[in-house]
Design a protein with these regions (language model features):
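Generic hydrophobic-segment detector
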Residues: 15, 29-36, 94, 103, ...
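Glycine-rich phosphate/adenosyl-contacting loop at the front of the ribokinase-like
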Residues: 1-61, 66-77
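Short, basic and Ser/Thr-rich N-terminal targeting/leader segments
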Residues: 52, 91-94
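Ribokinase/PfkB-type carbohydrate-kinase core domain
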Residues: 1-11, 73-87, 100-158
Length: 158
């Protein structure tokens, strides 16, 4: 089986459906569903590839917090190798709250968190070098990795 390294933006999404309005003050609104997912252009892609039967190795960053535990737990349940995810002490795992509207619109409230800290030093070069395929997702959402760090990583992947 071919190995795919899926590297980049890993986000824990909290989705609420259907949200017509945010109640004022301390009021409550009842909705149909709340769920959490592994999301972002690396984590979400990893889950999809794992569902298709690929051997997936996740490379990115997550906090040493409960959100990071939940995110990696979801990915592990799909058989994704998360052993190369860097746990960043004292930095919140990247997360998004999505109040999904009845018409399907998805405004987002986002914390960049650990994705803002991901850099070339976090990349397991031997894993990238030996992968059959490398997917990098999340340009412009990883300020330390964008640019030169991405170029260095792609040179390793050759």
């Amino acid at each position: 089986m071919k190995t795919v390294v899926s590297m980049g933006v890993h986000i824990l999404d909290v989705l609420g459906r259907h949200v017509s309005e945010i109640p004022p003050g301390q009021n409550i609104a009842l909705i149909d569903e709340i769920r959490i997912t592994a999301a972002g252009t690396a984590a979400g892609t990893s889950v999809d590839m794992a569902k298709l039967g690929c051997k997936v190795v996740a490379v990115g960053a997550a906090g040493d917090d409960e959100m990071g535990n939940v995110l990696l737990g979801i990915m592990n349940r799909y058989g994704i190798d998360t052993s190369h995810m860097k746990r960043k002490k004292g930095v919140q795992t990247s997360g998004t709250m999505l109040p999904i509207r009845p018409n399907g619109e998805r405004p987002a409230l986002h914390v960049m968190g650990t994705n803002a800290t991901f850099c070339f030093e976090d990349v397991p070069q031997d894993v990238v070098k030996n992968a059959d395929f490398v997917h990098i997702g999340g340009f412009y959402l990883m300020p330390k990795f964008d640019g030169e760090d991405t170029v260095k990583t792609l040179k390793v992947a050759r």
